[in-house]
């Protein structure tokens, strides 16, 4: 089981700001900041979007979780999702803005390559559906 979200933000079909898409492409796991400042719930955000909002990612205050507001920016002028962009640690695997079709084809090819590699390195038989 796996899930992906950030990779789909950086597609031509996504209705996301071009800066957000480029932030996904340029980002990696070290550029993710985990904080509850922007909504009251801890989440992962692109460091570059926090810096672009004039905030210091290393010195963010903690938000009061009893005051959750998913449309706010915490006690900042920046707004979550509009100015402060969420992202997962998988951003390092996104190398360019492309189509959903190309991304899914690449993921499928990577899956088959990994599966074949596991079969060669293991005495276990790969289950066939």
Indicate where each model-derived feature is located:
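Conserved active-site-proximal phosphate/metal-binding subdomains
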Residues: 1-129
